[in-house]
Curated annotation (Swiss-Prot):
Pfam families: Trp_DMAT (PF11991). Keywords: Transferase. It comes from Penicillium crustosum. Its EC number is 2.5.1.-. This is Indole diterpene prenyltransferase penD. PANTHER family: INDOLE PRENYLTRANSFERASE TDIB-RELATED, PRENYLTRANSFERASE ASQH2-RELATED.
Amino acid sequence: MTNSLLNNGDMVQGVELPDADQQFWWDSLAPILSRMLQCSKYSVQSQANILSFFKDFIVPSYGPRPSIDGEFFWKSYVTYNHTPGQVSFNFHKNKCTVRLSNVPTAPLAGTASDPFNQKGVVQTIKHIQKALPGMDMTIFDYFSEAFLVADEDTVGLDARKPVPQYNQLVVASMLGYDFEPVPRVKVYFNPRWKALQMNIENHDLIWTAINNLGSPIKSYKRTLDLLQECGNPRQPGGWIFQPEFISFDMGENMSNTARLKLYGFTTKTCWSHIESIYTLDRRLDDAETQRGLAVLKRLWHLALSIPEDHDENQDLPPCPHLTAGVIYNYELRENSAKPEAKIYIPVRFYGSGDGKVIEGLVDFFKSEGWDELATSYQRDFVSVFSTPDGKMVGEHHDISFSYKNDHPYVTAYYRPELIRPMERHIV
């Protein structure tokens, strides 16, 4: 990361978008994204290309802007306060790349025409095809049909939801983006509405859809079999894996090479449980897994400011938020002998504030020999997420960890603070 930021005004200021909704999202998010790109040493041409793609293909997907009193048009718990997206820095070997994600929202979301906000993701992917005409649609089309509720089946389904907050808890779809050498899209599907409509368990629907995918899934069979085995505990009351949602990559010339990820969630926050998740309840005990586990444990304690003498079988102090807990995933790669585990450390729910999270990350970077990141991270965080008048416009939400080829991959996810709607609202 860099020592100082250039003036980003030329690329983001004075840009006029087609309507007030898109203008709001651009004015709120483009300055943050631009500062992140500069901070991460993207070339000027790359910055321009990414911001252009963001303006033309991502900004429209955010949908209607918040109301004049700040209420989001479509509320979802992709962040703790319904902000419909995140931005992130991915750190690996002292290098930094920029990514972002959001919940595509169609203008009719929440109406009888689109009660569960399912149409936004389909519309956005079709729009992105204009920029990436070689993007293979096979897997997207398959999972869309498997996981999205058909229009004729949505009638009366909302009345069957098990809890009042179900619309916010079930993020039916989300899109993630990285940008180099060309934009690549990651699609997330949570099929709980479809499972409710079919009267089956959500995880059973996910496994059935994956197993019925056919030839594209054959090269993942070893890892799939292992994960499905984890649906049964090794001992009474032990850890089991039941997928909550999935994601997969889309891009040009990726017909059968898209990574597939299966996500789980737990409200248990003791280290011993995290260890079970990372090792598939000790089904994985190879040397690389053990090395990764040791590095994860160090980051877990540093990011959450956990004392060294904390009981590994004791949960963290409880957080009252409805979605508090730990998300994790298993990445499947072709012909791999084992899945790659990723743990999302929930610093917003269980951490001690941005200052302590920064302190923990800096200590972790130092321990990995990432000296440049250790030196610049606090300064760059403030530079990216502060306005000229000193207001902070972002906070840490999660820190993810995975371990590949004997190296850690760490991603810091941030919730951007949007500009006050009343400052941009056009009546």
